[in-house]
Every structure is written in structure tokens, then in C-alpha cells.
């Protein structure tokens, strides 16, 4: 493990060597805001930005009777939600991680401090890029995700860094796998497909880093700390999956009367538990479910 006295990010030499490799890759190839997309070209809103089979209410009675134009509108709104989720998450990570470096500068190894800085820099570029895409596509940024935004801005800054890394990993991993699962088909609007693909190159490194830090935490932390984190996870993970699966706020954004009111808890629950969404979540979150179950985070 890290030889730093009283380290707050204990990690094995083998894993720390892998983190150094992540830094090297990031220094040589990372998202460039100016060139990642052909900004002089239009975004084609007549094409789907995601697989239409993955619409939140697809396979439920609430999707029946919707016109093709309404389904296309929903697809763009849902993509706007996905990007908004990234924006709210990724602009909270830099102050969180830089705060850890400032507070624990003598208890985090130089290699890990460097990657936390790189991670933060990349998230700022992602946020700028997502905001520019949203404006170009004529999409509005959705409200901050209820509960998760408070977790990131109020709760995690007061907890030890490894716990902050774990929960940012869980949120980012769910959002990333969800976006990639639906956006990479050949029929998807080209600018949207490219945006998510290019974003994924950086995010794959972020996810690897988060996994290594989190796994090290569960190998070295006290039983009391582990039990506390597991208790938090068992509350947060189901809420996170539900939030990604269907966000009731969509009823406030449609140009037509949406079949589910923003406060209709029974219908919202029905969509969350629909067989179609259960199958979809099992497919897109297979890797995440296997990892969190191995660590006992949702049992």
C-alpha cells in the first residue's frame, strides 16, 4: 500500500503504477473542446439521438398512441436529461477533488494528486463541451438530480476522499453506461454519437481510477467505515438507477400533454418497474451490477 503516513487514499504499488499510466495517456490524448466536434456543422434534430427502443416509457401503456414526432421529441428531451446529468455531476467533481488535495495535501501521494488534478481538468472540459452541445441542439439544461446533487456538494466534501471517489464513480458509471448503450447505433444522429463516444475515452479512465481507489478502500478500511459506506450505498444505488431510468421532470418539458404527471407517484413507479426497463437496465448495467454485488453494495 501507499507508504505515505496516515494516507487517506491507500492504494497498492501495482495500482498506483496503473494510475501513473492513466496520467500519461491523459497528458497525450484527452478531449479537446475546440476540435472534438465539427462545431460549424448542424445537429440534425430530425434524427434520433438515441435508440428509440430505449425511450423511458417504451413498452408501457403510456407510449401507446404517441405519434412519431412525439417519440422523436421525447428522445431529444431524454438526451438533454442525460447530458444535464453529466453537467451537474462533472462540474461538482473539480471542487470536490481539488478540495481533497488542498485539505489532505500531505496525506495523498503525488501520483494520486496528479491524477485527481487531471480528472478535474477533464471534467471541466467535458462540462464546457456538453453545455455548448446543448445550446447548439436547442436543448434546455434540466434541474439538478434530486438527492445526488446534495450528496456531491454537501455530504461528500465532509467524508474521507476514498468515499467521495466511490460515490462519484457510481453516479458517473451509471450515467456513462446508460449513454453509451443507447447512443452508438449507426442510425443515431452523428454529432450526438460522436459526442458520447469521445467523452467515453476519458470516462473509461475515470471509471478505472474510481474502481481501483474503491477496491483499495474495501481492502484496507475499518469494519465500521465499510459498514457505513455499504449502508449509504444500499440507499443511494436503487435511487440512482430509478433516477436514470425515468425522470418525472420530462412532463414539464414536452410540447404536448405528457401521459404521466410530474407528481403521479403510482404511474412513475409503474414505469420504473416496467419489464422493458428491467431488461434494459440489466443489459446496460451488467458490469456495474457485477462489481457492486461483489462488494456487497446493494444487498
Descriptions of predicted regions:
Residues 86-94, 119-130, 134, 168-179, ...:
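Alpha-helical transition-metal enzyme core signature, strongest for iron centers
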Residues 82-83, 116, 165, 196:
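Short alpha-helical scaffolding segments that buttress acidic/His motifs in well-ordered protein cores
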Residues 112-119, 195, 199:
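Extended, well-ordered alpha-helical scaffold segments
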Residues 132-204, 228-239:
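Active-site-proximal alpha-helical scaffolds that flank and shape metal-associated catalytic sites
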Residues 99, 181-184, 215:
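Short glycine/serine- and small hydrophobic-enriched flexible loop segments
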Residues 1-113, 136-147, 158, 162, ...:
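Terminal targeting/low-complexity segments that flank the catalytic cores of oxidoreductases
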Amino acid at each position: 500500500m501507499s507508504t505515505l503516513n496516515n494516507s487517506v487514499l491507500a492504494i497498492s504499488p501495482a495500482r498506483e503504477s496503473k494510475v501513473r499510466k492513466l496520467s500519461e495517456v491523459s497528458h497525450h490524448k484527452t478531449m479537446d473542446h475546440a476540435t472534438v466536434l465539427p462545431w460549424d456543422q448542424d445537429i440534425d434534430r430530425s434524427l434520433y439521438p438515441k435508440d428509440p427502443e430505449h425511450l423511458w416509457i417504451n413498452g408501457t401503456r403510456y407510449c401507446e398512441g404517441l405519434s412519431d414526432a412525439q417519440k422523436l421529441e421525447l428522445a431529444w428531451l431524454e438526451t438533454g436529461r442525460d447530458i444535464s446529468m453529466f453537467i451537474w455531476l462533472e462540474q461538482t467533481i473539480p471542487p470536490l477533488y481539488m478540495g481533497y488535495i488542498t485539505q489532505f495535501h500531505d496525506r495523498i501521494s503525488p501520483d494520486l494528486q496528479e491524477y485527481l488534478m487531471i480528472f478535474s481538468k477533464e471534467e471541466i472540459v467535458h462540462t464546457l463541451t456538453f453545455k455548448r452541445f446543448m445550446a447548439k441542439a436547442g436543448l434546455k439544461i434540466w434541474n439538478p438530480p434530486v438527492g445526488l446533487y446534495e450528496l456531491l456538494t454537501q455530504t461528500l466534501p465532509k467524508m474521507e476522499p476514498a468515499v467521495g471517489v466511490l460515490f462519484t464513480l457510481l453516479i458517473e458509471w451509471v450515467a456513462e453506461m446508460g449513454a453509451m448503450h443507447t447512443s452508438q447505433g449507426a442510425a443515431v444522429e452523428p454529432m450526438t454519437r460522436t459526442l458520447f463516444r469521445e467523452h467515453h475515452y476519458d470516462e473509461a479512465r475515470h471509471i478505472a481510477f474510481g474502481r481501483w481507489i474503491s477496491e483499495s478502500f474495501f481492502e484496507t478500511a475499518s469494519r465500521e467505515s465499510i459498514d457505513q459506506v455499504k449502508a449509504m450505498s444500499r440507499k443511494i444505488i436503487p435511487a440512482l438507477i430509478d433516477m436514470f431510468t425515468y425522470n418525472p421532470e420530462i412532463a414539464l418539458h414536452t410540447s404536448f400533454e405528457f401521459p404521466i404527471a410530474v407528481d403521479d407517484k403510482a404511474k412513475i413507479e409503474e414505469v420504473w418497474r416496467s419489464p422493458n426497463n428491467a431488461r434494459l437496465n440489466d443489459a446496460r448495467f451488467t458490469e456495474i451490477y457485477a462489481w457492486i454485488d461483489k462488494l456487497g453494495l446493494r444487498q
